[in-house]
Each structure stands twice: as C-alpha cells, then as structure tokens.
Amino acid sequence: MEKIEEQFANLNIVKRSSETKEPTYLLGIDTSKTVQTEKGSLVAVLCSNGSIRIHDKERLNVIREFRGYPGLNGVKFANSHDSVYSSCTDGTVKCWDARLASGKPVQLFKGYPSNIFISFDISSNDHVICAGTEKVDDDALLVFWDARINSQDLSTTKEPLGAYSETHSDDITQVRFHPSNPNMVVSGSTDGLVNVFDISADNEDDALVTTCNSVSSVSFIGWSGKDYKQIYCMTHDEGFCWWDLNHLDTDEPITCLNVPDVREVINVKEGILDYLIGGLYHEKTDKLFVVGGTNTGIIRIMNCMTSGLVHVTSLQGGHAATVRSFCWNMQDDSLLTGGEDAQLLLWKPGAVEKTFTKKDSMKIASSVHQRVRVHSNDSYKRRKKQ
C-alpha cells in the first residue's frame, strides 16, 4: 500500500465548485454516509450567509440550498440516512432532508429558554443529538435529544431529554461523539477544558470519565488511536493537545503531546504556518494528522507523533485565502476543502491538475478568533474510580 504521506503529497485538484451569485465563506463540510450508486455522494456545506448548500460530490454542482438561517454552527449528515443537521443560535438544532427541495427543516430539536447553540454532534447510531451552548448567566449546557423517528409521534418538534450543566464554565465550542461507541462523547470549551462523558450513566457526575485541560480556548476536538481511545484538541491560539485515555487507570501519563503554539515550533518546508484548521485520524494506518494553512490559501498537513509534529506536505494552487473547513473521505482517499475565497475544492491522489483562476478573498470579520483566553496550567485532571 502506498504510504499515506505519499498519498497526501500526491493530492491534486479534480474539481472546483462553480461560482455562486452570493460569494460566502465556507465554514463547514460533511459528506453523506449512505451509498448512493445512481446519484453519487452528497456534500453539505455550511456558508457564512446562514445557508446550507447540498452539492453533488463528483461535479460539485449545487443541487439545492437551504437558505435564511442566520446563526447556524456546524453541519453534519446522519450516519444511516440523508438527513443534514446544524445547530443554531436561535436555540434549536435543525434537520433537513437532503433529498427534498422544499428547504424547510423536517425536524426541530428545541432547547431550553435562553439556549444559544454553537456546537453539536449526532451519535454513531443516530439515536442521540448533543448540542453545546454559549454561556448565559452562569450556565453553559450540553443539551441532549432523542433523534430517533417515532412512528407513534410524528410531530416535527422535539423537546430535550435533559442537560449537563456542571462541567463547563464557559461557551461550549465543540461536541464530538465517539466514532463507534454511541455512549461516549467529548466536549470542549473556551474555559480550556475537554471533558469525556459516558452518557449511559445515570447522572452527570457519574457520566464524567475524565477532564483534560488545554489551557486555552478550544477550537476543535476529535478522537484518534486504535479503537479511538485517544482524544485531541486544537485551540484558538493555535495550540495542540493529545491525550491517551488508555492510561487513565495506569501510572502512565495521559498526555501524549502538548504544543502551546504550533506556529512557533513547526518546521515547514518553503514557508510558514498561520493557523490550524482541524485533525484527521487515518484509521487504516493508525496515524493522526493535523491540518493547518496560510492566509494565502496554502494547506499544510502535519504528522502527529509523541515526539512532536512533522510537516508532511503542502497543497498549493487551490485556495486564494484562508481555508476554514475540510472533509477527508477514507473510502476513496479524497479531500474536500472550503475557504474564505468561497471555493469548494475536491482533491484526489494522482489526479490531473487543472488550471483555474483564483478568486480574491472576501474580508469578513471572524468572531471565532476573538474568543482566545488563557487559563490555569493543569494539563489534565484524573477522576478516581470509586
């Protein structure tokens, strides 16, 4: 098998989305998990104008657009059907059917009064949705719903199952369910904490498995490692932390790597690193990669090891401005990227690169980088099993 590092270095642009009437930042990307042999896979893109665009993955044509929803955060396909979800600052998580052109949400998951949702995820079996709120008064909540469709109850609005309120003290910026265990979920916050929960427990205190401290405002979290027993996060000031949950019940340190500012330590061939975008765990090779970029649109891919981060390759000639989102497909080794130049790009290894005209960057103020805060220095806190 070709080394994954060589595959990344071999990525070239296959397709570029056509220009839209209203250029927007592309803030989030996800692909449908269902097999669609006739129509091909679908791609959902969250845009900065409060819309979600559904693209055909092979041609990147816009099939339909769900418009008019300012305050959306994140975009995610269900794992077993073509429903698309996004959380909203209006206190709901919205669900659309990507196959329907009506544009109206088919389901609304309502929060508690004054909830402002800024993060969410759906469990691997599509049974539970969890959303994180901004801090209002003294509360930052993780709110849960039953996402299953009940033939006895066909109402389109769902009330919460309950909420966790004791474990974060500030905006909950990230929520990520375990890729295969629907009971495990990790959350990250501007309070610097990354909390791991087992939601099969009876209450919040028992559900909290461990608390890790990134010492800064969390911008991205993910699962990695064999059986996904590791977690990692990035921070709004470009830090990176990586923890091994296998060591919770041992004397081994839980922290695999802690880099306060990746920009200062990474040795990038031919240039610099301006920011981190997210992480990519390659299950087949059991390798974790960190994805970052430059303000001129170059994408940097870095290999993550306990000894540090090593620059693997740079993807150039695609974007003309900051890259805000990406989605890696393990099945065909393809990469989708979106940025502040309003472009959606499809990259594949060894593809014939085509010549395109770079679009100028649109300068829209980003609120996410105004949330940087520095916190106490305890890198993690173990919870003793009773």
From Swiss-Prot:
> Mind telling me which InterPro entries this protein's record contains?
WD40/YVTN_repeat-like_dom_sf, WD40_repeat_dom_sf, WD40_rpt, WDR89
Q: What UniProt keywords apply to this chain's record, in alphabetical order?
A: Repeat, WD repeat
Q: Where are the WD repeats?
A: 21-65, 68-106, 111-155, 167-207, 213-253, 318-357
Instruction: Give the Pfam families listed for this entry.
Output: WD40
Protein name per the record: WD repeat-containing protein 89
Q: Which species is listed as the source? A: Bos taurus (Bovine)
